[in-house]
Amino acid sequence: MNPIIDGIIALEGGYVFNPKDKGGATHWGITEATARAHGYAGDMRDLTHAEAYAILEEDYWIKPGFDVISTLSWPVSFELCDAAVNIGAYHPSAWLQRWLNVFNHEGKRNPDIHVDGNIGPRTLAALEHYLAWRGQEGEAVLVKALNCSQGTYYLNVAEKNHNNEQFIYGWIKNRVT
């Protein structure tokens, strides 16, 4: 079992449907659209914990490469996965790439990487170099930096669509940690 996925399921909880939430009905953090994309045809209230776990692990842990990042940094992988469940994997992956680029001392520590939202060998190498250079303190700073990006993302979402104002307090409280 993956404690990150278990924690996300515990945080997301059971079935929720709020008409103002553009994600629609969710259960265990899985939107109906995502469940359907995985072949689930039942009522969202009936989505099992095991089905949700499998979807979360595939879409928000393995596919984006956060499982590989966990071999370098468990805290960074947790932050990326948790954000991805809430907003998709592209943004957290791109934030990581952007932060690694600006933390590299103008390319003196390692070359800039292309910001494409895909975790590949260059992103992994940049993260490995950063962590070797900055250590545990740098790891904690990187997690804070990712949280800064996530908070800014939520602020922009709420400002663009006022229906999201009812969600932003909870997003900041539960997701920007």
Where do the language-model regions lie?
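Cell-wall polysaccharide-cleaving catalytic domain and substrate-binding groove, primarily
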Residues: 1-177
